[in-house]
Amino acid sequence: MTIKTLALQCRDAAHVLSQLSSSAKQALLEAMAAALEHDGAVILAANARDLEAAREKGVGTAMLDRLALDTKRLDGIAAALREVAQLPDPVGQITREDVRPNGIVVQKVRVPLGVIAMIYEARPNVTADAAALCIKAGNGVILRGGSEAIHSNTAIARALQSALREANVPEAALTLVEDLRRETMLELLQLSDIVDLAIPRGGEGLIRFVAEHARVPVIKHYKGVCHLFVDASADVDLAVRLLVDGKASRPSACNSLETLLVHADIAERFLPAAAHALRERHVELRGDAATRALLPDIAAASDEDYAAEFLDLILAIRVVPDLDTALTHIRQYGSDHTEVIATQDTANAEQFVQSLRSAVVMVNASSRFSDGGELGLGAEIGISTTRLHSYGPMGLEALTVERFVVRGEGQVRH
């Protein structure tokens, strides 16, 4: 079956989804969570095959962590589906209503986008998360995962599709692309008359390929080169907490810290404490000359280090003379994802927030809060770094669009 045929079937199934009531979608998602739990042993066995193949290829620890499933993670995926089931349904929400002078009633109403192509790499949880969010918002979803997770993704998709069948919803509403040739992905990205949105999540190469070749609209979930700037007025203990949580709690996450910028006036007090805390968590440090003057046993940082998304226990450090220099550094090397300032100076905090165009800006809070669930969206399909209709963590509302519904009593325009 061609990718165009699969996409057409998904579009037809999306129409069925768009007509489901909120209670029917909630019941469907609850059933999908139960199906994941029922097929848990099958899914974990499939994941073990993917992990074995990845190790044989010499895949790094960060990629292995993103790929790995265990009972706890699988339970977490099922719980996430149940959380999505309980979220308010955005479809049908009236976001604006106005009565015009001629008596017509003008409403803006949320409706599903249609068909969403989700293109991603080694995170099998995305298969379930993306499917749940798209279905809750009344969209069909075409899932194209990476070859590293093909067995895991297939097992998860089959479990979820079984719940669709039981609910008499066409299983094409959740379509997994099993032909992973790049030519097939390219063909999918050309289907502008069928696919309404493509969302790539993964490495820089994948996202560039999608952005350069797609004829459908694309919302990029680009790399997370996230910074913490420790201002001169920062509370040292607070800043160390933000640093350790942001770097070491889950370094493979896109909202983990990659670069630390430290005001010169606090560097002598802050850096030794920070280095001690990070070394306890086995973080490799790389710094500029001013940093190495205080931490002489660390490696030198290069320009490539400051631009890197390590996704590992590695941190680049630079000492800066002032806030403006920190902001210039972030604008040069950052990826518009998430930036953090530790400061007790309200004016500096406001300047930091207003001077950056990043999707998420934090003041005295960990970068790890850059997450849909943590920010009150309930769940997210990813973190958009594209300045379109959605910017930052994308929840259910970002998977809908607003259209006008006009109600009248025979009014005409002369």
Swiss-Prot record:
**The keyword Amino-acid biosynthesis appears for this protein:** yes
GO cellular component terms listed in the entry, alphabetical order:
cytoplasm
Organism of derivation: Xanthomonas campestris pv. campestris (strain B100)
Reaction equations catalysed:
L-glutamate 5-semialdehyde + phosphate + NADP(+) = L-glutamyl 5-phosphate + NADPH + H(+)
E.C. number:
1.2.1.41
What PROSITE patterns does the annotation carry? Answer: PROA
The function of this protein is: Catalyzes the NADPH-dependent reduction of L-glutamate 5-phosphate into L-glutamate 5-semialdehyde and phosphate. The product spontaneously undergoes cyclization to form 1-pyrroline-5-carboxylate.
Name the GO terms of the biological process aspect. Answer: L-proline biosynthetic process
Q: Could you identify this protein by its name?
A: Gamma-glutamyl phosphate reductase
Q: What is the lineage of its organism?
A: Bacteria, Pseudomonadati, Pseudomonadota, Gammaproteobacteria, Lysobacterales
